[in-house]
C-alpha cells in the first residue's frame, strides 16, 4: 500500500491531475467531458458523462453518510462545521465585496476558525444520523448553486489551514511517538484465502485518492481551472496538491496500522473510517501536549470539513454534467440551447434528490464497483489528455503509461467483481 501511494502519487496521480487541469486551461476552462468531445467525439463524451454522473451520485451518497456518521461520533465537530459555513460566507463578502485585504482576512479567518473549534467543544450538537443526512442534502443544494466566491472558495481556502495544521501535527507526532505497526506488513497476495479479490488488481482500485483518482479530473477541469490567476500556477496546484495528498495518505496508513487489531474493528463499528484515522492521529498528537480528546476531535473536524467540501464540489460537478447531457447545440449557429432540465436549480435538485435517495442505503448495492469506476474515470481522463497532447504535437508518453496501467487494473477488477 505504501509503495503504491508513493509511486502512484508521483507518477500517476500527479500527472493525471496536472494533465486534466492544464488541458482544461488550454480549452478555456472547459470540463473534461467537453475536452473528450473535442478529442474523442460526441459518443465518447456522452458515455463518459453518463459514467461520471453516476459515479458522482455514489460519491455524494457515500460522503453524506461518512460526514453524518462523523457528526454523530464527534458532535463537537458538527457544531464547528456549521460555524465554518457562516464564517466562510462572511469571509467571502468581506474580501470580494467589502475590499478587505486577503492577508488581513486570512489572519482574522484563522483566528475565527480556532474560536469555532472552541465553541464546538463547549456546545456539541447531538442529532441522529438521518437528520444529519437531510441537513447535508439541503446544504449541498444551496452550496452548489451559490456563486463560488461566496461559499465554496472561501470555505475551501480557510479549511486548507486546518489541513496544513493537521498534517504538520500528525508528522511531528509520528516522529516523536515512533509508533509500531499493529497490523502485519504483509500476509498474502490473496488476503481472503478464497482465490477472489487478490492484491492485484484490488489494491490499485481500493487505494485511490492517495495515489490517483478520476474524481480529481472532474474537479480540476470543472472548477479549479476557472480560478487560477495564471497558467504558471497549474503545476503547483495540480501536481503539488496531489503530492500533498500522497503525504496525507501515508499518515493514514501509519494511523490505521498503529490502531490495528480488535480496536480497529471497534472503531470502524462506532464512527467509521474517520473515527479510526482520528483515533490514531489523535494518539500521536498527545506527544505534542494535546489531550487525547481535544486532538481526536480536531482531527475528526478536519476530515469532516474536507468531506463536506467534497460533497458540495461533487454536487456542483454533477449539476454541470447533468446540464451538459441535456444541452443541445444548434447545428447552424453552434450555440447551446437550454431547456428546463438545464436550469441550474432543476439540475441541482435532481442531482440532490437522486443522491439523497441513494444515501438511504441503495448506494451500497453498487458501492463495491465504485473503486474500479473511479479509476476507470482516471484512465479515460488520461486518454483524453494523451490524445490532445498528440494532436498539438507534444510528447504524451508520460500520460500513456499510467493510462495503460489504469485501464488494465480497472478492467480486471471489474471482471472479478
Predicted regions and their residues:
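Flexible loop linkers connecting adjacent transmembrane helices
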Residues: 15-44, 223-226, 230-233, 237, ...
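Hydrophobic alpha-helical segments and their helix-loop junctions in multi-pass secondary transporters
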Residues: 92-97, 111-134, 142-144, 164-189, ...
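Loop-to-transmembrane helix boundary motifs in multi-pass membrane proteins
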Residues: 39-57, 240-247, 295-296, 308, ...
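Juxtamembrane transmembrane-helix boundary signature
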Residues: 7-33, 96-99, 216, 310
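Hydrophobic, small-residue-rich membrane helices and short re-entrant helix-turn-helix hairpins
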Residues: 32, 146-163, 215-248, 268-269, ...
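Hydrophobic, membrane-embedded alpha-helices of multi-pass small-molecule transporters
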Residues: 129-146, 172-179, 189-231, 235-240, ...
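Extracellular/periplasmic helix-exit of transmembrane alpha-helices
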Residues: 174-189, 243-279
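Transmembrane helix-loop boundary segments of multi-pass membrane transporters
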Residues: 5-9, 51, 62-82, 100-105, ...
